[in-house]
Amino acid sequence: MTAARDVLVVEDDADLAALVAMILDDAGFTVRSASDGRQALARVAERMPGLILLDMRMPVMNGWEFAREFQARHGRAAPIVVVTAAENARLRAEEIGADGWLEKPFELEDVVAVADRFAGRGAPGQADARRA
């Protein structure tokens, strides 16, 4: 079962993950965090989130590996929004079949807008989450 306003933040930068969690918590979301893809798969097994905010470069299991494994196990059970500093963020998001992307650095209100747009929907959406 998908928890509608539950966001899973998959980010190895602890400070950034804490900041995103604080912003989303203040906006009324339930936030769980994982520092790599393997930990994220464990969080998903506990409870399917309404949205996965996914960093691409992480130790242990990176974003590509996580997305591939998540989709093999769960299909499109929760939307994935790629969060990356890569210039080709949209291409990277499309490569893994993500529902959107958010480019680093981002404005804090953009995180809330993306969560509002995608959390709880659980279905594929438009590729451009930057202007939610």
Residues covered by each model-derived region:
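Non-catalytic signal-transmission and effector/linker regions of two-component phosphorelay proteins
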Residues: 1-8, 109-132
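Conserved acidic carboxylate
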Residues: 11, 84
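Charged docking surfaces used in two-component/phosphorelay signaling
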Residues: 18-26
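Acidic, metal-coordinating helix/loop segments flanking the phosphotransfer/catalytic sites
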Residues: 33-51
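Acidic catalytic/metal-coordinating carboxylates
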Residues: 36-39, 62-66
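Active-site residues of response regulator receiver
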Residues: 55
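Receiver (REC) domain active-site loop signature in two-component systems and cognate sites
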Residues: 58
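Alpha4 helix (beta4-alpha4-beta5 surface) of REC/receiver domains from two-component response regulators
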Residues: 65, 86-102, 113, 117
